[in-house]
Structures are given as C-alpha cells and as structure tokens.
Regions:
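NTP-dependent small-molecule kinase module
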Residues: 134-202
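Conserved substrate/cofactor phosphate-moiety recognition/catalytic segment
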Residues: 22-60
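Hydrophobic anchor at the beta1->P-loop junction of P-loop NTPases
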Residues: 5
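A glycine- and Lys/Arg-enriched "phosphate-lid" helix/loop adjacent to the NTP-binding pocket
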Residues: 87-158
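Post-Walker A alpha-helix
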Residues: 16-17
C-alpha cells in the first residue's frame, strides 16, 4: 500500500507522516529538501532558479515513486510527484518564474514519468490557512523559508485546492488542520486515524 501526504509549506506533512508511520507501522519516506542544491539560491532569486529547482524535485520524487512501486512494504510518502507538478511547478510558471519553453519541457518530462508509476492508494491533503502556515514556518525556523512571501503561500494554497478538486484522479482524504494539534493532542491524531481507517477499510 502507498499513501501520499500532500500539503503546503508548513502544513505539518512531515510531522503527520512520522506519526502515521509509527501508528500503522508503515515505512516513511521524506521529501529531499535539505539536499536540494538549488534551495538557498531559489529563495534569493525565484526567477533565476525555479526551473532548476523544480526539475531536481521532479527527478527525486520520480525516483521515490519508482522505489515504492518495487517495494512490498506499506509506505507513506511526504509530498507526492503529482502535487510537485500541479502545485509548485505550475505556481512558479503562473508567476512568471519559469518560461513557456522550460515549462513545456518540464511537463513533457512529467508525462513520460507518470506513465511508469501508479497513483497513491490514498492521498491525504492537509488543508491550512496562510496564517497557520506562517506560524508553523516561523516555529520551525528554517532560514531559507523565513523570506517566503505571503502571496507565494496564498498562490500555492489556491493551486492545491484546484489540484485536489479538478486535476487529481485518485482517492483523497481532506483534513483541515488549522484547529488540530496532532503532535501534542492524541485525540486529534485519533480523529485523523479514524478517518483513514474508514476510507481504507482498515
């Protein structure tokens, strides 16, 4: 079984991935952020580095999903191939950070890749307001994230809603996380696991 956790920057994906992996004894896989050689440059100059950053992420996510497809383990993945394309890369393109030519090349790469992999058995989307995202980003203190514009986060939120409603073809569980604190309140985690159990018939 393959579960994907989707959500904006600061929505709590990694924390929930860790907790669900422990709860269900699933194997967690995490997005490669620290190792992305373009990350610091990207936040300093979005226009110059967006295409390189997105291609790097696309390559890493494709490698992850290929490994998952060959594994017999139950795996939960922090951020999916598909949201990387239809949310983050599409947002960079819409904001003029990726040229028409580069985006066309990027989408052609994605179309080749997506034919080789399956959709998650369940996509869990953590929906969050921008103020909640900003609060979480400030708390965790990653230096390269502190200068992210509010407009950028709002653009990503809009893209996520469009992605979940109109573009993604698989099974989705939407969880509004603004009023949840599953890291410190067991009852909040149980609210989530009860929904997962119901959707997956566990």
């Amino acid at each position: 079984m393959y579960i994907g956790i989707a959500g904006n920057i600061g929505s709590g994906k990694t924390t929930l991935t860790e907790m669900l992996a422990e709860h269900y004894q699933w194997e967690p896989r995490y997005e490669t952020v620290v190792d992305n050689p373009y990350m610091d440059d990207y936040y300093k100059d979005l226009h110059r580095w967006s295409f390189a950053l997105e291609v790097f992420f696309l390559k890493e996510r494709f490698k992850d999903v290929l490994q998952i497809s060959e594994s017999e383990n139950n795996i939960i993945l922090d951020r999916t191939l598909h949201e990387g394309v239809f949310v983050f890369a599409a947002n960079n393109y819409a904001q003029g950070n990726i040229s028409d030519r580069d985006f066309e090349t990027y989408m052609e790469l994605y179309e080749i890749m997506v034919e080789k992999v399956k959709l998650p058995d369940l996509m869990i989307y953590l929906r969050s307001s921008v103020p909640h995202l900003v609060e979480n980003i400030q708390k965790r203190g990653r230096v390269y994230e502190q200068k992210i514009p509010i407009e950028y986060l709002q653009g990503l939120n809009d893209r996520y809603d469009d992605f979940i409603r109109n573009k993604y073809k698989g099974k989705v569980l939407v969880i509004d996380v603004d009023k949840l604190d599953y890291k410190t309140r067991p009852e909040d985690l149980k609210l989530i696991t009860d929904q997962i159990d119901s959707v997956l018939s566990i």
